[in-house]
């Protein structure tokens, strides 16, 4: 089950994305000829494909938890569950095509994500960039967590699932690919990391392979 050549980006909210985000999205699309590219905007989600999703309905109608980050966390999981492909934050500047990543995967890989080394020397997983085959095990397990922790999920739930279930179908890439602060020979995107979206990763499993 291979990860399809589809790039998903999202912009939710009632304002248009800033010019630089729009430009990065256009660069992403131009860099991937032959790929399907989709920028999902507010109406596409809330008045379209996921208008009946109970969690999104509650997020957007509950003033105490009206947070775009909660919504975005769920939306990107839903998109990869239903379509497969690669999710990339809209504020990520593309440097090299994601063909580089797909060429490193084998037929067993149904999910990939990237890590970032922190100043405290912990290894962290971020969710600004990740990819999955349609209806993948990891994505479905993350979505199942919403039943109990719909107000406290984010990338922590996402990261914990990867840690606990990391196996032959999961590929992890080191920080050079998605979360380097400067250009390097492996840089795929440059992204402004938000530390609150990062989580510790236990590297105690000798079977874990990291590029």
Task: Label every model-predicted segment.
Residues 73-85:
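Small-residue hinge/turn detector
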Residues 1-72, 88-211:
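Glycosyltransferase-associated regions of secretory-pathway enzymes
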């Amino acid at each position: 089950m291979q990860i399809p050549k589809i790039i998903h980006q999202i912009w939710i909210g009632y304002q248009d994305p800033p010019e630089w985000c729009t430009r990065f999205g256009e660069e992403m699309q131009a860099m991937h000829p032959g790929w399907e590219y989709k920028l999902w905007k507010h109406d596409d989600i809330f008045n379209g494909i996921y208008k009946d999703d109970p969690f999104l309905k509650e997020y957007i109608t509950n003033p105490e938890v009206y947070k775009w980050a909660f919504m975005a966390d769920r939306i990107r999981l839903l998109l990869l569950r239903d379509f497969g492909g690669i999710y990339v934050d809209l504020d990520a500047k593309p440097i090299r095509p994601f063909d580089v990543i797909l060429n490193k995967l084998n037929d067993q890989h149904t999910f990939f994500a990237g890590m970032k080394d922190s100043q405290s020397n912990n290894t962290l997983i971020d969710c600004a960039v990740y990819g999955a085959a349609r209806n993948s095990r990891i994505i479905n397990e993350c979505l199942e967590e919403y039943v109990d922790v719909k107000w406290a999920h984010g990338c922590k739930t996402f990261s914990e699932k990867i840690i606990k279930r990391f196996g032959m179908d999961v590929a992890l890439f080191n920080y050079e690919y998605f979360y380097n602060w400067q250009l390097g020979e492996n840089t795929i995107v440059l992204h402004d990391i938000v530390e609150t979206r990062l989580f510790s990763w236990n590297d105690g499993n000798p079977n874990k392979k990291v590029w």
